[in-house]
Amino acid sequence: INVSDSKGKATGSSIAVIEGKNSIELNNCDLTGYAIGRGTGGVDDAGVMVYQSMSGDADNGVGTFSASDSKLTIDPASGKYSTAPMFFVTNTEGVINLTNTELSFGSGKLLNVAGNNGEWGTKGANGADLTFNADNQNLEGLITVDKISTLKLNLKSSTLKSTVNSANSGKEVDISLDKNSTWNVTGTSYVTVLTDEDTSLDNIKDNGNTIYYDSSNSSNSWLEGKTITLNDGGVLTPAE
């Protein structure tokens, strides 16, 4: 599905839902949803959801959501406004591409990559593997990843204001920043791999918080297993 130069509101659903090996691409759109899903217990209440239902009506594969020069809003009038994440990915492999797109939501939860209660896939084996690419993009909000899910977050000329994987629950959580990107750290965060074109780490605004990384992962060899004091008194340090 490709949509350009459009404005719309859905008062009984999410902004967009992708099932299986399908894609949605938005350009210069202004879309609003109520973040209302159909799963039990509200597990799929989200602004945008990428998933695989296993019902047979969509091929297995990568689900891709892309938006450029657009605005995505969870309506403040929705009963889900204060609780629903902007993005939820479950039981699938997914890609989210955002370029110069405004996100408006009230929960403080940017992204949840996680399994579900068994409605889609087998509970305990229905996590997600997500690649999230941000280009000229402002991102703000909590990022959570559960023990059966992975996230690769790539920032290009973008800003991230977030606590990432605060429970240290993610199976793998990788963050990559180019030299023109900034991570404003709002709380203790755990990453598997940290890649930064700015090897001085000056583009990480730590606010006194701690970032833990996996010193046994060869992709972190440039950090030499060290504890590094960041500019605002926080540290980047190996996880125990």
Regions found by a protein language model. Name each.
Residues 1-12, 17-38, 43-79, 87-106, ...:
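Surface-exposed loop/turn motifs in large extracellular/passenger domains
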